[in-house]
Amino acid sequence: KDFFDTGITWSNSLNVAQMLDKSSYSISLGNTHQDGIISSTGMDRYNVKVSADTKLTNNWSSGFTANYITTSIDKAVTSGNGLLRTVYAAPPSYDLAGIPSHVDGNQYTQNSFRGSFDNAYWAMDNNKFTEDTNRFFGNVYASYQTDFGTTNHKLNAKYMVGVDAYTTHYVDSYGYGSNTGGGRGQIENYGWTNATYNSLLTINYDWHINEDWGLNAVLGNEIIQSNRKKYYEYGTNYNFPGWNHINNATTQQTEEETWKNRTVGFFGNVSASYKNMLYLTLTGRQDYVSNMPRNNRSFFYPSISAGFILTELDALKNNVVNHAKLRVSYAEVGQAGDFLENYYSTPTYGGGFYTLTPIMYPMKGTTAYTPYYTIFDPKLKPQNTRSYEVGADVNFLDNLITFSYTYSRQNVKDLSLIHISEPTRRSYI
């Protein structure tokens, strides 16, 4: 009751939009502020969105959308030395809020109800867990449309490029005097940087052949490029109190990992219809991926589907059966795994729940490498899922009664056991 507050959330937004003769635009601003039930916790988020579209000529149009979001979160200390360990453990007879959290004249020596855990009030002032995220995503496009001066042909071509990029940074710090870090403090800085770029080209063609026949065809190309980076900094034993920073740590350890992968795909789709009664669709996609072994980086997956609407037949048009359809389909879906060439990494060792890390590299100016504990299969193939489906849909009495039946089956080929783990037995210094 004395420790917890009432959580509050405030949200504000502003939107301005206008339609012009051949253009439109929209601007949105937003903010969310949150105070947590623990006084040291909360969140602030700001977001901006801008979009615009314009018709350049009778055939050409263009537009863009851009979004930016920034989020800052102050979190409660968790894990083995969490805030609530002393809050819930203290009996009503112990005045946790009234007794000073530290010794008079020395703010880095705690008055602890439970000696193995930090005083909750002291921890709110000296231990900080934060999370900061900045994200930008958006796209820009250009499209071309024409009917070739006829009523039965239409062509629509569109090219769009987009990006989704974000960074998330975490800081988990225990101040000088905390029971975590041996009494001299500990800090972890870690996070992600991720940027995904997308290029998409589609060409859509509609042909109204005659009163009975119709045809639609789609061709396209897609390129996806993803760049990721993970970093980690760990430091212990601050030189002096009051500055929870990695540069204040006498012992430091850093790690960094980067990934890059690219997918290039070509796809097509052809659909034919007859009297709004018979439908046939063929699709196919060829993908080339970078995150597979060199000899298995391309794969093709097609599909075919057909439908027959029985109630379009004159003999079956009545007031009892409103709609009756038979459908059948076959499809393949390809899925690439995650493949890495074997490499070496710096080992890490745990010392148990209540002990410090026994060995930390670099040690006395020397680092160490061991074969990574995950072995990837050099013969890995893209996983292929084949599915078969047969079904029927029937509606009766103005859709008062409906019946639907589907039988489907899936078979997975080259199911990916992508990697196995083995004990690390060798080290190289």
Task: Label each PLM-derived region with a short phrase.
Residues 19, 30, 175-177, 408-410:
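Generic beta-structure capping elements
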